[in-house]
């Protein structure tokens, strides 16, 4: 199992709405994330910079790349687009983060 982390950007003033939408995550999206191999998924917010930091675990045989091809993922991205920085294809702009320390 591999742990990865990445950064996204939340638009100023959108904190509460971002939390509200994630508190009511669509069951079919949660199922799709799990089916792709994602587990122990956390998203943290730095309120000063509006950066979101996501951390998740995935197995070697994950299918995360295929999520972009699913209807539910595309609908979620469209639903969230007014809250965060997105690319031309509608997906959130993500910056992979390099692990610097781990204590087990």
UniProtKB/Swiss-Prot annotation:
Give the record's GO biological process terms: rhamnose catabolic process
Q: What is its main location?
A: cytoplasm
List UniProt keywords, sorted A-Z: Carbohydrate metabolism, Cytoplasm, Isomerase, Rhamnose metabolism
Which GO molecular function terms does the record list?
L-rhamnose mutarotase activity
Binding sites annotated in the UniProt record for substrate: 18, 41, 76-77
Catalytic activity annotated for this protein? alpha-L-rhamnose = beta-L-rhamnose
Q: Does the keyword Cytoplasm apply?
A: yes
Tell me the compartments it is located in. Answer: Cytoplasm
Pathway given in the UniProt record: Carbohydrate metabolism; L-rhamnose metabolism
Functional description taken from the UniProt entry: Involved in the anomeric conversion of L-rhamnose.
Specify the protein name: L-rhamnose mutarotase
Organism encoding this protein = Burkholderia cenocepacia (strain HI2424)
């Amino acid at each position: 199992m591999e742990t990865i982390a990445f950064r996204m950007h939340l638009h100023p003033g959108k904190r509460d709405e971002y939390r509200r939408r994630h508190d009511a995550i669509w069951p079919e999206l949660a199922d799709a994330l799990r089916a792709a191999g994602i587990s122990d998924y956390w998203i943290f917010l730095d309120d000063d910079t509006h950066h979101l930091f996501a951390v998740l675990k995935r197995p070697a045989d994950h299918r995360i790349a295929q999520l972009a091809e699913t209807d539910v993922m595309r609908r979620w991205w469209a639903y969230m687009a007014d809250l965060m920085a997105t690319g031309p294809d509608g997906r959130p702009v993500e910056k992979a983060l390099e692990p610097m320390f781990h204590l087990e």
